[in-house]
């Protein structure tokens, strides 16, 4: 089309997405599990209820407000696939700050360019990540990136591995120190439907990464509607999207969509082939996953090891299989299905 295309949703509407994803569930499903976290190590897992998640989000929101973060400010999140990633996203939304997540596997240069481009005032990271049995030096990478990011005033660091990392006086704060003594309630910032919710950068495969801005009202409706209807989600089911929160699929189908619908969402820190190539199917059995959403690349990689690693698991709980990220070839789909 020629000329400007402008699409606006519910333009005079006001909401805060965390009220839709958290507060409205407290009366009826406060003690239901919101997030099942499955660690890189198969022996590590935890569960967070809606009530617990709400409290943790409010505590971080209060800490961020105390650091001067205001509605419209940009906050960079550079975290592994741990509960804190979801808490950080929702805490930003709670106070009207715009989150910009950078995938934990990206380099200091990639992190720096994204922080500079969106002029972030706060970085939320961790000491280290874990991936396939190896440590990922997130704080070291962040410190390197921040040498060229004068806009960052504060850094909140989650203690994940307990690795020894440098902390800069006045700038860096341990997550627990910043949050643990904060009140467990926090007033949600009223947001216009067209107010920004997050920025996420394109992969950069076709030139410089571009920051794509997603607004509040239309995005949440789409996330909730598609999670409910595309996956035929039924109350009480366990939903697992294997994406990283660093990608838009992770934003939508690990955090915002499932939580808006009061679902139990699974968050996986690891990789499909660690410690064995049966890992996906073992996790499905362990947590009785009903809906499974993964990528053709992962399926094709697992196909190379044949059916034996799959068949040693039950997978009886599965009802729906989804594929995302690229077109799936018939051979991969038939093997998967």
Swiss-Prot record:
Residues noted as binding CoA in the record, renumbered to the chain: 131-134, 249, 273
Catalytic reaction equation(s): acetate + ATP + CoA = acetyl-CoA + AMP + diphosphate
PTM comment text: Acetylated. Deacetylation by the SIR2-homolog deacetylase activates the enzyme.
Gene Ontology CC terms, in alphabetical order: cytosol
Cofactor: Mg(2+)
UniProt-listed GO biological process terms: acetyl-CoA biosynthetic process
Domain of life: Bacteria
EC assignment: 6.2.1.1
Keywords for this protein: Acetylation, ATP-binding, Ligase, Magnesium, Metal-binding, Nucleotide-binding
Species for this entry: Nostoc linckia
InterPro entries membership: AMP-binding, AMP-binding_CS, AMP-dep_synth/lig_dom, ANL_N_sf
PANTHER family reported for this sequence: ACETYL-COENZYME A SYNTHETASE (PTHR24095), ACETYL-COENZYME A SYNTHETASE 1 (PTHR24095:SF14)
GO MF term set: acetate-CoA ligase activity; ATP binding; metal ion binding
Protein name per its UniProtKB record: Acetyl-coenzyme A synthetase
Binding-site residues for ATP, renumbered to this chain: 325-327
Lineage: Bacteria, Bacillati, Cyanobacteriota, Cyanophyceae, Nostocales
Family that this chain belongs to: Belongs to the ATP-dependent AMP-binding enzyme family.
Reported function: Catalyzes the conversion of acetate into acetyl-CoA (AcCoA), an essential intermediate at the junction of anabolic and catabolic pathways. AcsA undergoes a two-step reaction. In the first half reaction, AcsA combines acetate with ATP to form acetyl-adenylate (AcAMP) intermediate. In the second half reaction, it can then transfer the acetyl group from AcAMP to the sulfhydryl group of CoA, forming the product AcCoA.
PROSITE patterns assigned: AMP_BINDING
């Amino acid at each position: 089309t020629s000329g400007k295309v402008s699409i606006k949703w519910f333009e005079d509407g006001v909401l805060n997405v965390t009220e839709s994803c958290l507060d409205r569930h407290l009366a009826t499903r406060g003690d239901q599990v919101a997030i099942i976290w499955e660690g890189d190590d198969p022996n590590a897992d935890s569960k967070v209820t809606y009530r617990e998640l709400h409290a943790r989000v409010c505590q971080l929101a209060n800490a961020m407000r105390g650091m001067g973060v205001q509605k419209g400010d940009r906050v960079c999140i550079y975290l592994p696939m741990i509960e804190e990633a979801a808490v950080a996203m929702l805490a930003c939304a709670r106070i009207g700050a715009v989150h910009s997540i950078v995938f934990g596997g990206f380099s200091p240069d990639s992190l720096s360019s994204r922080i500079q481009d969106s002029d972030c005032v706060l970085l939320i990271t961790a000491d280290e990540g874990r991936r396939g049995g190896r440590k990922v030096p997130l704080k070291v990478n962040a410190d390197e990136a921040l040498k060229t990011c004068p806009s960052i005033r504060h850094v909140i660091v989650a203690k994940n591995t307990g690795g020894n990392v440098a902390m800069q006086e006045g700038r860096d704060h341990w997550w627990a120190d910043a949050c643990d003594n904060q009140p467990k309630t926090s007033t949600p910032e009223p947001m216009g439907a067209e107010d920004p919710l997050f920025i996420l950068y394109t992969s950069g495969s076709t030139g410089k990464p571009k920051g794509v801005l997603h607004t509040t009202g239309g995005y949440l409706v789409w996330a909730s509607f598609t999670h409910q209807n595309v996956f035929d989600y039924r109350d009480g089911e366990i939903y697992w999207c294997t994406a990283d929160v660093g990608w838009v699929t992770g934003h939508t189908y690990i955090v915002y969509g499932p939580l808006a619908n009061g679902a139990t969402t699974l968050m996986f820190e690891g990789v499909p082939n660690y410690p064995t190539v049966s890992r996906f199917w073992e996790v499905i059995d362990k947590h009785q996953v009903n809906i499974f959403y993964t990528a053709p690349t992962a399926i094709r990689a697992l196909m190379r090891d044949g059916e034996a690693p799959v068949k040693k698991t039950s997978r009886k709980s599965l009802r729906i299989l989804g594929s995302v990220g690229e077109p799936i070839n018939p051979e991969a789909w038939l093997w998967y299905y």
